[in-house]
A protein has these predicted regions:
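Intrinsically disordered, low-complexity segments enriched in serine/proline and basic residues
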Residues: 6, 30-33
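Compositionally biased low-complexity segments, especially N-terminal hydrophobic helices
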Residues: 8-9, 333
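N-terminal non-cleavable signal-anchor helices
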Residues: 9, 19-20, 136
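Nucleotide/pyrophosphate-binding catalytic subdomain
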Residues: 26
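Fe-S-dependent hydro-lyases/dehydratases of central metabolism
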Residues: 34-452
């Protein structure tokens, strides 16, 4: 292992991890056997990082390749870092720091938190993306800060989106992040893997968001708790990166620790303009052991809508068509990319959004905003009656703006529809794809995009 992180000494069946520069000794006992079957992608990544054969169920201390904090979770993580005796972070170049949830600052407390994080970044020589770049997960991906075989942690539950790049990426709490900031490593219980096998081509105006909502309906909100979802099959092998990001992003909505797409030509073509990355073969062995395997054929998949107040309560759009809405939100780290916005524009055509509702569109990052601007999409949306905002999380987490009053209904392309997620606990949030959102915004009610 890289001694920069820690040294590993194996004594019989006991692993002793020593963090250089600290009086810190970690003991971990693997529970799996060495004569097991082939390995999953998750097991292979941890084996590479730990320098020995690792199996699901093993508890290991593993180095991380990147650690992300934002304006909500970052301040507490930093305070925990100091409470643990931290003076200098383990590696400033591996820490990703930015603001996206409450930007521009919508309260004095938010402004103070951002000042605190700016001062920390300056003192620690950490590059600060600040509030300029967009939503954390989109920024990590488009800056090439996640790559195949890496372990990335983030103080945000949707960190699992980086699995679209072939990384093992997972969300952690602020206490764990404080530890990571100091030591550059973290304890993990290596998860079992559920293989999601897909086949078929998407029908017209049906796409990755509909697929992942249907998978959530099938697996359930806790059906993949502390497991990795491995997305495979010809549907994924032909899926572009934006769709893979959408699916990996929502792995956590089934309780998963991570979502991973085996890296391929699409992955490396995406990364090559963003960073130098060595191509590695990273796929599960034919004889790997899976906790479960599920098969999904998208050939006849209908547009999906998740009804309040859980993501796994997805139904075919026809079951809720005609439901009046007060607001349509198009954006978030799940569906705020250029491809999503282009789909919205295609459904919109020469039409205009229903004037009885609010339509909020937020590109996921500055780069995605500029792509849409150059393509004429922003002007088209504004002309049609939408409010187009600067890249940020917006209404998704009930933050700075776009909140719902009691009794109001939102249709959203985001990833969660929990009670109170976008404002009042007496409001209702439905989740859908960009195509369904656009069609519904035209008529002020949930609408099947195939009928527009």
């Amino acid at each position: 292992l890289d001694a920069k992180y820690f040294a590993v000494i194996t004594l019989s069946n006991l692993t002793c991890s020593v963090v250089p520069g600290h009086n810190f000794l970690i003991l971990a006992c693997p529970i799996s056997t060495e004569n097991a079957m082939g390995a999953t992608i998750a097991e292979k990544i941890f084996s590479l990082k730990c320098g020995r054969k690792i199996r699901s169920g093993d508890v290991v201390m593993a180095p991380v390749d990147g650690a992300m904090i934002h304006d909500i979770t970052g301040p507490l993580a930093i305070r925990n870092f100091f409470e643990m005796g931290g003076a200098r972070v383990f590696d400033p170049g591996r820490i990703i720091l930015l603001f996206d949830h409450q930007v521009p600052a919508d309260s004095i407390a938010a402004a103070e938190n951002q000042v605190f994080m700016r001062e920390f970044a300056n003192h620690q020589d950490i590059h600060n993306y600040d509030l300029r770049e967009g939503i954390c997960h989109q920024v990590v991906m488009e800056k090439g800060l996640a790559a195949p075989g890496e372990i990335i942690v983030g103080a945000d539950s949707h960190t699992c989106m980086y699995g679209a790049a072939g990384a093992f990426a997972t969300g952690i709490g602020s206490t764990d992040m404080g530890f990571v900031l100091k030591f550059g490593a973290l304890y993990f219980r290596v998860p079992e893997t559920i293989r999601i096998q897909t086949t078929g081509r998407f029908p017209w105006r049906v796409g990755p968001k509909d697929l992942i909502l249907s998978i959530a309906r099938n697996i359930g909100a806790d059906g993949a708790t502390y497991q990795a979802l491995e997305f495979t099959g010809d549907t994924f092998s032909s899926m572009e990166m934006d769709g893979r990001m959408t699916c990996c992003n929502m792995a956590v909505e089934m309780g998963a620790k991570a979502g991973i797409v085996p890296p391929d030509d699409i992955t490396y073509n995406y990364l090559k303009s963003r960073r130098d990355v060595k191509r590695v073969t990273l796929e599960s062995d034919p004889d790997a052991s899976f906790a479960d395997q599920r098969m999904y054929d998208v050939t006849d998949l209908a547009p999906q809508v998740a009804v309040p107040h859980n993501v796994d309560l997805a139904v075919d759009v026809g079951e809720v068509a005609g439901t009046p809405v007060d607001q349509v939100f198009i954006g978030s780290c799940t569906n705020g990319r250029f491809e999503d916005l282009a789909e919205v524009a295609e459904v919109l055509g020469d039409g205009a959004f229903d004037t009885s509702i609010r339509v909020i569109i937020i590109p996921a990052s500055r780069d995605e905003y500029l792509k849409a601007l150059r393509a004429g999409l922003i002007e088209r949306f504004v002309t049609a009656g939408a409010l187009v905002e600067a890249p940020c999380c917006g209404p998704c987490m009930g933050g700075a703006f776009g909140l719902l009053a009691p009794g109001e209904v939102s249709l959203s392309t985001s990833n969660r529809n929990f009670r109170g997620r976008q404002g009042s606990t007496e409001a209702s949030v439905y989740l859908c794809s960009p195509a369904t959102a656009a069609a519904s915004a035209l008529y002020g009610e949930i609408t099947d995009p195939r009928e527009v």
